[in-house]
From Swiss-Prot:
Gene3D superfamilies reported for this sequence: Acid Proteases
Entry-linked PANTHER family: BETA-SITE APP-CLEAVING ENZYME, ISOFORM A-RELATED (PTHR47966:SF51)
Induction remark: Expressed under high amounts of nitrogen via regulation by GLN1. Moreover, components of the fungal-specific velvet complex VEL1, VEL2 and LAE1 act also as positive regulators of expression. Finally, expression is induced under acidic conditions in a PACC-independent manner.
Name of the protein described by the UniProt record: Secreted aspartic protease FUS4
Keyword Hydrolase annotated: yes
Gene Ontology cellular-component annotations: extracellular region
Signal peptide location: 1-24
Disruption outcome: Does not alter fusarin C production.
GO MF entries: aspartic-type endopeptidase activity
Origin species: Gibberella fujikuroi (strain CBS 195.34 / IMI 58289 / NRRL A-6831) (Bakanae and foot rot disease fungus)
Function per UniProt: Secreted aspartic protease; part of the gene cluster that mediates the biosynthesis of the mycotoxin fusarin C. Within the cluster, FUS1, FUS2, FUS8 and FUS9 are sufficient for fusarin production. The other FUS cluster members are not essential for fusarin C biosynthesis.
Amino acid sequence: MLAIATLHVALQVFGAFSLSHAAAVTLEHRSAGNSNIAAIPAKWDVYGYLFNVTVGSPPQNITMLSDMTWMAPFVRSGRCLSQFNPELCVAQGQSFFNEHDSTTFGNTTFAQATWPVTAFAPNFTVDYGRDKFCIGNICNKDILMQVSDFPYPGSVVPVIPFGGIFGLAPTPKTITETSEPVNFQAWKNGNMGPLVGWHTCEVLKSAASCQGGDAQLVFGGTDTTMYSAKKIQSYEIQNPEWLSDAFYPSTPPRSNYWTVVDEGSEGLGAPLSLNGYKYLVRHIKSAKLASKAIVQNIQQQGSSGYNTANQDWYTVSCDGLDEFPNLVYQLDGRKKYTISPGDYVTKLTDMPGSVCYLNVNVWKYGRTENGDARVVLLGKAFLKRKYLVLNFEERSFGLAPLLTG
């Protein structure tokens, strides 16, 4: 590397980034072969990682989007405009959960909830119901879930390749039932451990651990073959008030983010402040503003779009990456993590010739007037060489180097 080829992103992150240091946390790691642990393959889609569950009795197969900022599980239903009418409420080709076909579904007395702004639909309105919910071979009765009841016909919402959202956000300090993810409810009922493990197979020599998918989620424990427990660094989550609407405006304000980890559905690229991005571009001689056609192609690579800032995109040479800077992230004043050029320079595979671009995410919420950032979003580019452990009991998460084989 060149002498200047290190861009040090000195962030007090995951204290959201407060100056206080997160306390060390002891995690209980259990093998993915345990009977109350489910290891599930997930496929990458432009929306994020998708995996399958079953809901109801008899079981209905539902493809879920993994979302580390969502809370209680959500399913598309045959409801809209306060009525059950699948012909009106579900667009042709859209998968959904049919509550009338389940003998175990029940409504609840929880009030209807609406989020005016989401990446999926405007005025995102849900009712709450309960039903049997299975992750792999682990089934839980009476799981509280969100059931769509949008204030418009189903034709208004574009067809998407999943029928639900699997929330993986930590519970807030003051826990309410409507804020509990499926796995938290299962742990509370003694059917599953409090941990969730995650890794992608993108950089592995063998993708066997992902079971035919692009990533693996382990509910109730972790895959201890993919990392060394001795090398895990843990962080307690800390959510200041100003972070409460980091993803979407929310009433009441949110205080339960993994401050801030997201597996890719909100930002694929290496996270930088605007100033950091400009610095990076200045130190890469081949960087050129991308054409409109290339920008359109880049945007089709993935991301929900809501939290992606209006930023310039740059093409760079696909060669000579050893002259590009490393990106070094220091979390909470402690552990430093590095993203090498090979992980933030991405080649567009569906364009003629050899076209590479800087896959950098200047998060919308992270922008400030002076170009610095109080918060960055650690997405896929950061996590693909890490094993991620979410601890719902301790409200903490851990990172360890992924054993690539």
